[in-house]
A protein has these predicted regions:
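Bacterial extracytoplasmic/cell-wall-associated proteins, especially those involved in peptidoglycan
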Residues: 19-163
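Bacterial N-terminal signal peptides
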Residues: 6-15
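Positively charged n-region of N-terminal signal peptides that target proteins for export
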Residues: 1-4
Length: 163
């Protein structure tokens, strides 16, 4: 009898656990897309489509790197990695058109990044695997001197660590 009750509890609660898992995954995915869109918007909203994609690639490259957090929001909000996250200004997008574009790029990139990278073996990454970038008009970071420039896209220079 006890085994039967245990079995019934498992049968009744298993679908609820599965649904909760899907809901949590969906919420996590939405949060990551939002964080990616924020990063694209605040780091590159005045850049071309290619420039915005490049910022998205660096963000996603960090997600798959062992040296950074394993979620987009973790990467974006890692302490002092992106200037907009600690500049004291509002983190709410104000330019509606630029925000819509950043969201569209983020949704596309988040949904397709792993497939693009697997199929093309990284050839679709316009940043050539960069984990870092900076805008020379705004900064000349000392850490960049230790790295190799792999691309300049719009107003950003993209770098990889020297091996």
């Amino acid at each position: 009898m006890r085994t039967l009750i245990t079995l019934l509890v498992v049968i009744v609660t298993w679908p609820l656990q599965a649904i909760a898992s899907v809901v949590n995954d969906d919420a996590s995915e939405k949060a990551d897309i939002y964080c990616l869109a924020q990063n694209i918007y605040f780091e590159a909203r005045s850049e071309s489509h290619e420039g915005q994609l490049a910022v998205g690639y660096v963000t996603m490259n960090r997600v798959v790197s062992r040296r950074f957090p394993s979620s987009v929001c973790g990467v974006v909000w890692q302490s002092r990695q992106f200037s907009w996250t600690h500049d004291g200004k509002s983190d709410r997008p104000r330019d509606t058109l630029a925000w819509k574009k950043a969201k569209a790029i983020a949704e596309h990139m988040y949904s397709n990044y792993y497939r693009f990278m697997h199929i093309s073996k990284g050839a679709t990454d316009i940043t050539k695997g960069a984990l870092h970038y900076y805008a020379p008009k705004m900064a000349n970071p000392i850490w960049a001197k230790e790295m190799t420039t792999v691309a300049q896209i719009g107003g950003h220079v993209f770098l990889v660590e020297e091996s």
